[in-house]
């Protein structure tokens, strides 16, 4: 029995690794650098690095910047500290950008699988759902085609909000209190993309209305 569980765990790991490697293929070529938005993202990293090197902790870019992006109003900048700090160690700018995309895609695979596995209680279904989510054309286009990194980050963290809904509707208890999980999910989306946050909030409101008996009655509040 234990050996069967180990073999299932190993097969799940390799399936997820295959999903990650397949979706990350553009990172091993110059395809991920062909988007018209990539220069904007590279200059964004370099600009934040210059500010930090000068001792200025500026988290948001000017709203009316030279690339005409409302970055400060639409995308968070907290997670950009990872490539910025790597850049400050002397790593090449393009390598830092690729590493950032690798981290985003890995987080997407892990969080989507965790949410689907708890929701369906079936590892095979969770693996298939993870592949569909991580290989979705709109997600790959945001990550590689349009280089909309804030949006891609939002889609990476959206499963955390879905995990809250899965546990709240099913009245399941996890290691974290439900209110804390919801707060973490909203905070992650706030620091990623305001557009994806709006999608998440609409989904949250819809579920609160549709599953109002499970979520809003006494037992539902106690679950939170």
Model-inferred region functions:
Residues 152-171, 203-204, 210:
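Specific aromatic-rich, kink-prone transmembrane helix
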Residues 164-188, 217-224:
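Short hydrophobic alpha-helices at membrane interfaces in multi-pass membrane enzymes
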Residues 119-124, 169-173, 200, 213-214:
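Membrane-interfacial segments
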Residues 9-13, 122-128, 175-179, 219-223:
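Membrane-interfacial loop-to-transmembrane alpha-helix junctions, especially the N-terminal start
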Residues 23-119, 124-157, 188, 195:
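Active-site lumenal/periplasmic loops and adjacent helix-entry segments of GT-C-fold
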Residues 181, 189-197, 201:
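Active-site neighborhood of glycoside hydrolase catalytic domains
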Residues 1-26:
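Start-transfer (signal-anchor) and selected internal transmembrane alpha helices
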Residues 199-224:
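Perimembrane helix-loop-helix junctions
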């Amino acid at each position: 029995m234990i050996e069967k569980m180990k073999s299932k765990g190993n097969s799940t790991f390799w399936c997820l690794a295959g999903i990650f490697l397949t979706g990350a293929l553009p990172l091993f070529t110059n395809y991920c650098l062909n988007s018209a938005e990539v220069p904007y993202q590279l200059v964004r990293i370099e600009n934040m690095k210059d500010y930090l090197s000068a001792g200025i902790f500026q988290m948001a870019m000017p709203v009316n910047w030279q690339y005409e992006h409302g970055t400060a109003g639409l995308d968070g900048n907290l997670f950009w500290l990872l490539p910025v700090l790597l850049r400050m160690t002397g790593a090449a700018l393009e390598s830092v950008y690729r590493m950032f995309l690798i981290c985003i895609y890995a987080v997407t695979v892990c969080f989507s699988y965790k949410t689907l596995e708890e929701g369906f209680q079936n590892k095979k279904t969770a693996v298939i759902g993870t592949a569909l989510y991580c290989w979705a054309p709109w997600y790959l286009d945001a990550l590689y085609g349009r280089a909309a990194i804030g949006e891609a980050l939002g889609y990476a963290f959206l499963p955390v909000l879905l995990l809250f809904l899965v546990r709240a509707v099913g009245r399941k208890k996890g290691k974290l209190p439900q209110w804390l999980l919801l707060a973490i999910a909203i905070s992650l989306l706030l620091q990623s993309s305001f557009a994806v946050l709006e999608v998440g909030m609409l989904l949250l409101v819809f579920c609160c209305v549709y599953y109002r008996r499970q979520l809003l009655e006494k037992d539902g509040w106690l679950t939170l």
